[in-house]
Amino acid sequence: MLEINISCPNVKEGGIAFGQNPKAVEAITKEIKKRARQPVIMKLSPNVTDITETARAAEAGGADVLSLINTLTGMKIDIHRQTFALANKTGGVSGPAIKPIAVRMVYQVANAVKVPIIGMGGITSAEDALEFILAGASAVSVGTANFYDPAATIKVAEGIEKYMEQHNVENISDLVGIVK
């Protein structure tokens, strides 16, 4: 699979990240699909008014899978130097603080498109991962947690297996999107 990150808040084109423009998302997805030999995952930006618009655009362009969310745009100010702490003034915020937003967006997108979703954003435990799955993610991705615990992903997977045993769930797909 090939994941295309169309949502980096640090790279701008004409003042707006092109991943925030549904027409641009559909067009770039179509172009990539014409050339790609493998399934295409489009990584969506959360920095939009309605993420379902860009999700539908990516699906219309032929995306095989959607991954969401990428980082939220944030800012840090160095109070001692009284200036921006980041070279671009703004940058991506990730980790546990964005999880409630990410779960909401996965839920919204899962109810708007038919393609599978990889949920991400603040997953540090099996409980976090299960929230994404119950909201509609077919798979999850663990990022920031791996920096402070290299075994985080293994712990998440083991915790999901334990949950499934405790709840007599044979196939994880039986949990995908069951919270309505």
Q: Positions of the model-derived regions?
A:
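Residue-level recognition of conserved structural "scaffold" positions that shape functional pockets
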Residues: 102, 128-129, 150, 166, ...
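C-terminal helical cap(s) of enzyme catalytic domains, especially alpha/beta-barrels
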Residues: 77-91, 133, 145-170
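Alpha/beta enzyme core
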Residues: 1-118, 124-135, 139-142
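Small/polar glycine-rich anion-binding or flexible loop at a beta-alpha turn
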Residues: 123-127, 149, 180
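A short, charged, Gly/Pro-tolerant segment at domain boundaries
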Residues: 173-180
